[in-house]
Amino acid sequence: MNKTYVFTDIHGQYDLWVQIKNYIDESDQLIFLGDAIDRGPDGIKIMREMLADPRITYLKGNHEDFLTRYTSPTNILLWTKANNGGRPTYEALLQLSEDERAELVTAIKELPLWAAYKNDKGQCFYLSHAGFTPEQDLYLDHYDLLWDRDHFDDQWPTEEEFKNTYIVHGHTPAIYVAHRRNELQLVDYDPGYASFGIYTYEHGHKICLDLGSADTKKIALYDLDEMKVEKYFYGQKEKDTQGSEEET
């Protein structure tokens, strides 16, 4: 049976991307919530492969938004600051030909900001990079869909029409969203690597998949048909760290 999966915020971790693309079947569909680039070394490589993969619906993230504005000197300085992590991406862009850069920037500018998916159980998912509130106008709130962190405390509507509606997002690591809401006990626990996983909140209606992959070398592949994590994938750095901890 064909499956539909979602993942987010891979931030240049090519080994994680290789694991995911090799794990899914040719007939599966994959929704990526943005931020392929920055922080890690291989964002441009990942981005170009994703754009060429027919299985993938690629949504724009705030770091893709940085890339589309990189030609401005002021934006280059902002983008490549250490806290934004754009330096490896900017340097990789300079290795492309002028035509290749122009083609890539055009493709990124045209990426959608959100997607919707309804599974066979009648559960309807709205997906974007940063997340949003159910009553938002998805066609107008460009900034919020890429950058917003104010929706975390919004209460889920009680109307019947929202009963089978869910919002899936990245942008902010799950552990930080849970900490802000004082709900660390609700963060999914990954016993395989004794570390945090995804965070589901607002009575199960909002799902944060960002695991801070650039630092943790870990990413979640979420199954929209079964509403659960299909698998956690781990990069080499975390495996090495885990191994050294076990030896001591």
Show the residue positions of the predicted features:
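N-terminal active-site segment of His-dependent metallophosphoesterases
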Residues: 1-49, 53
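Active-site neighborhood of divalent metal-dependent phosphoester bond hydrolases
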Residues: 40-116, 121-123, 148, 153-157
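Active-site-proximal beta-strand elements of phosphoester/diester hydrolases
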Residues: 3-11, 124-131, 207-209
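Active-site environment of divalent metal-dependent phosphoester hydrolases
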Residues: 11-15, 38-41, 64-68, 135, ...
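Acidic, His/Gly-rich catalytic cores of divalent-metal-dependent hydrolytic chemistry
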Residues: 159-248
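Divalent metal-coordination and catalytic microenvironments
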Residues: 9, 35, 50, 61-62, ...
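Short, well-ordered beta-to-alpha junction loops that form the rim of enzyme active sites
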Residues: 119, 123, 128-132, 170-173
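Catalytic phosphate/metal-binding cores of nucleic-acid and nucleotide-processing enzymes, i.e., regions
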Residues: 6-7, 75, 115, 134, ...
